[in-house]
């Protein structure tokens, strides 16, 4: 059964470190290889019978290098807009996402001030211009994964003259997003190519 296998995996992967884990409230996991496909939070502590997520707050990091860099970052004091969202971009190559539009509209009501761009206004150019000023950046658009070249994986926005609307990993890495909380409400944003020493190169990795 699922629970039996979840307990076996817990014992194989985490039991040896149980003494250290028991002292911590937060657990940061840096998976390797096929372990990126494993939701550690669903493992079951064979002693307590509880899911790991019930006992600890679980976080993931793509590599130790990225984790170290994140820990050394300082918090900036810039004036940032509370909430910036993009949803339901208009494209011929993907289906519309009307529920994503409602999603960001409802969340935007909880923030003041907020700026929400949908359909034809949800452009790549506007993301690049507005995102550096956002405290919370919420992107509810289609994602496109390139397994051959992970730097060409992209979030899909509304195209306009001289702009294909594909915000690639390479482009995201060049953006300045000081201390922003980024929410990727898209399919496959945590999928990508696992490289030795670098970890998982994905759309979510690009925002770290």
Model-predicted segments: where are they?
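Catalytic cores of enzymes
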Residues: 1-208
């Amino acid at each position: 059964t699922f629970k039996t296998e979840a307990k076996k995996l817990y014992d194989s992967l985490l039991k040896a470190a149980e003494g250290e884990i028991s002292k911590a409230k937060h657990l940061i996991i840096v998976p390797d290889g096929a372990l990126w496909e494993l939701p550690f939070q669903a493992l079951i502590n064979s002693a307590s019978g509880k899911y790991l997520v019930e006992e600890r707050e679980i976080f993931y990091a793509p590599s130790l290098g990225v984790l170290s860099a994140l820990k050394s970052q300082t918090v900036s004091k810039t004036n940032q807009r509370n909430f910036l969202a993009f949803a339901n971009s208009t494209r011929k190559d993907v289906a519309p996402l009307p529920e994503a539009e409602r999603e960001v509209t409802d969340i935007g009501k909880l923030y003041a001030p907020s700026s929400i761009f949908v359909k034809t206004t949800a452009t790549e150019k506007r993301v690049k211009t507005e995102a550096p000023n956002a405290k919370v950046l919420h992107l509810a658009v289609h994602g496109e994964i390139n397994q051959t070249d992970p730097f060409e994986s992209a979030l899909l926005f509304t195209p306009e003259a001289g702009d294909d609307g594909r915000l690639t990993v390479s482009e995201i890495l060049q953006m300045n997003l000081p201390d922003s909380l980024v929410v990727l409400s898209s399919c496959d944003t945590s999928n990508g190519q696992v490289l030795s020493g670098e970890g998982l190169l994905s759309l979510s990795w690009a925002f770290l």
